[in-house]
Amino acid sequence: MSRGLIVICGATATGKTALALEIAQSLNSIIISADSRQVYREFDIGTAKPTPAEQDLIPHYLIDICDPRETLTLAEYQEKAQSLIDKNLTNFPLLVGGTGLYIKSIVKGLKIPRVAPQPRLRFQLEALGQQQCYQILQQVDTISSQKIHPNDQVRTLRALEVFYVTGIPISQQQGENPPTYPIVQIGLDCSTEELKRRIEIRTKKMLEMGFVEEVEKLVKKYGWELPLFKTLGYAEILNYLQGKLSLSEAEREIILHTRQFAKRQRTWFRAYPEIEWFDTTSPDLVENVFSKLTETLGLLN
């Protein structure tokens, strides 16, 4: 019996959702989100979640599964996603998104320490500041410190958290156990100028859809200190609401920071030779992707 996983990845604003909907409808399959912010409820416009209408077309999973005050670990994401994949392999489920580590955890079968978040420990570590935390990491887990950027607070805290809970460096608890089922990885890309244009259009559309109002509502409900408010788009709108930026300045900053983020995503995904790349602007995109899927997974046109 034919079975396999279809991955659609690439930088933000490259059309992953639209392509995924086309393929999933043709295969009568499901879409599993691989986006680290779309897991959170109420953070909708700024995370470019599929619209309710799009979600009505095809079953979507791992969207709106967490309270914004919660933290979803990579291990928890991997467990949830892998369970969905295993149950739907014969329908060729689609894993879709731009969070490279989420996708890597599945396609590489990453071995991830099952250490639950430790709020008190994190609070104590955060009080030390990122610079001191990174210095501690260099002492207790040199290997991890060489892989983690000095300014990457999330990964630094996680590495220290695992070390203090288990007594073993996270680098010694990691490895890979790739799945045995077939996987086709489809990457979407376009020229830098086209991506810039798409990001500008998307940002304007978000603002027109009520992005500012979304953030105002979230601040009223949760206060100003949610970690998610430090992420792309939300941080800039928060600065606008606090009078630090005009709305046009916030828009320009969102566009700039999104372009920088997209560049990092491109660099990440380009490092994996198994990804088959397609020009998202091609009028034959869907046909070309289906040809690849048919060739690799034995799908019937």
From Swiss-Prot:
Positions of substrate binding: T12, A13, T14, G15, K16, T17
This protein's record includes keyword Transferase: yes
Keyword annotations: ATP-binding, Magnesium, Nucleotide-binding, Transferase, tRNA processing
Function comment: Catalyzes the transfer of a dimethylallyl group onto the adenine at position 37 in tRNAs that read codons beginning with uridine, leading to the formation of N6-(dimethylallyl)adenosine (i(6)A).
Protein name: tRNA dimethylallyltransferase
Cofactor: Mg(2+)
Enzyme class: transferase
